[in-house]
């Protein structure tokens, strides 16, 4: 069993980003990410701060907009429109979840698809499904990078994605499909889940249920990618896989913490650089 070290790979990606940011800056394009936070959700604040810190460390300019929880939908849309029109901004990210009175989908559609570094805009989703180049959601994109770094073969393999969220499950399934895996997507209505997962060469579990994937659901030699981050009552962080028991059967597994998590912000930076490169092309 080999542990997939997301911290090490994310450090490698950040180093690439740092070099690319320096090259772009020399050419007069300073990569810039705008992050919008609505309300005072503690977890969201933590995420936004870590994104800001990562940008700074890699030479990406970051703009942070903190809005009151009672901000109107139209005021948020106005801010997004002004950032869409600002040529110096490469990426726009609205930290989710949003307060109840704001329609999340409507907001995500207002972000210019050329600045949608989270990859949530319908145009980018469509590009991913069609196998065209666009922005891909950061977590699945990071997982694909982990496969690449560890020379994990995807083509021709049976892959099972547990969870069908727009942020992880669906884009993950599309990326695996584009890489020629045979993909099954399972979810809360799936029957006989263990029967399906036992045939899988690759399992990506992303449902937010602690220790959900048990050893008897996994075949020997499988690759398990655990996207879950769950805090137990004793404050311990665990994933969606029962790590202690599942790990013994795997050829590769991501730990929690230190597996998939660090890759998410690294790929957000990578997407911001990609957008800045597109801006440079437009300027030429």
From Swiss-Prot:
What EC number(s) does the entry state? 1.5.1.5, 3.5.4.9
Q: Can you name one GO molecular function term for this protein?
A: methylenetetrahydrofolate dehydrogenase (NADP+) activity
Q: Which GO terms describe its cellular component?
A: cytosol
Q: Which residues bind NADP(+)?
A: 163-165, 188, 229
Q: In which pathway does it act?
A: One-carbon metabolism; tetrahydrofolate interconversion
Q: What does the record list as coiled-coil region(s)?
A: none
Q: Which UniProt keywords apply?
A: Amino-acid biosynthesis, Histidine biosynthesis, Hydrolase, Methionine biosynthesis, Multifunctional enzyme, NADP, One-carbon metabolism, Oxidoreductase, Purine biosynthesis
Name a single GO biological process: tetrahydrofolate interconversion
Gene3D superfamilies for the chain: Leucine Dehydrogenase, chain A, domain 1, NAD(P)-binding Rossmann-like Domain
Catalytic activities: (6R)-5,10-methylene-5,6,7,8-tetrahydrofolate + NADP(+) = (6R)-5,10-methenyltetrahydrofolate + NADPH; (6R)-5,10-methenyltetrahydrofolate + H2O = (6R)-10-formyltetrahydrofolate + H(+)
Q: Which PANTHER family match?
A: C-1-TETRAHYDROFOLATE SYNTHASE, CYTOPLASMIC, C-1-TETRAHYDROFOLATE SYNTHASE, CYTOPLASMIC-RELATED
Subunit structure of this chain's protein: Homodimer.
Which family does the record claim for this protein?
Answer: Belongs to the tetrahydrofolate dehydrogenase/cyclohydrolase family.
Identify this protein by name: Bifunctional protein FolD
Q: What is the species listed in this Swiss-Prot or TrEMBL entry?
A: Campylobacter hominis (strain ATCC BAA-381 / DSM 21671 / CCUG 45161 / LMG 19568 / NCTC 13146 / CH001A)
The gene for this chain is folD
């Amino acid at each position: 069993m080999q542990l997939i070290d997301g911290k090490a790979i994310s450090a490698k990606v950040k180093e690439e980003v740092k070099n690319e940011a320096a090259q772009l800056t020399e050419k007069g394009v300073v990569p810039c990410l705008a992050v919008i936070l609505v309300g005072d959700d503690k977890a969201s604040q933590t995420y936004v701060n870590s994104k800001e810190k990562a940008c700074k460390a890699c030479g990406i300019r970051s703009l942070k907009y903190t809005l009151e929880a009672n901000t109107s939908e139209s005021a948020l849309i106005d801010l997004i429109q002004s950032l869409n029109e600002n040529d110096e901004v490469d990426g726009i990210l609205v930290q989710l979840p949003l307060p109840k009175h704001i329609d999340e989908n409507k907001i995500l559609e207002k972000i210019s698809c050329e600045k949608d570094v989270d990859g949530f805009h319908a145009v980018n989703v469509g590009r991913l499904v069609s196998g065209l180049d666009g922005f891909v959601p950061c977590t699945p994109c990071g997982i694909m990078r982990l496969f690449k770094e560890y020379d994990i073969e995807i083509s021709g393999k049976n892959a099972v994605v547990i969870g069908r969220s727009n942020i992880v499950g669906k884009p993950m399934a599309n990326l695996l499909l584009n890489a020629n895996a045979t993909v099954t997507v399972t979810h809360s209505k799936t029957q006989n889940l263990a029967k399906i997962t036992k045939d899988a060469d690759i399992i990506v579990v992303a449902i937010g249920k602690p220790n959900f994937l048990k050893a008897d659901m996994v075949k020997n030699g499988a690759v398990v990618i655990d996207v879950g981050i769950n805090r137990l009552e004793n404050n311990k962080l665990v994933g969606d896989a029962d790590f202690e028991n599942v790990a013994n059967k795997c050829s590769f597994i991501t730990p929690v913490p230190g597996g998939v998590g660090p890759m998410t912000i690294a790929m957000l930076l990578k997407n911001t650089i990609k957008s800045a490169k597109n801006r440079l092309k437009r300027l030429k």
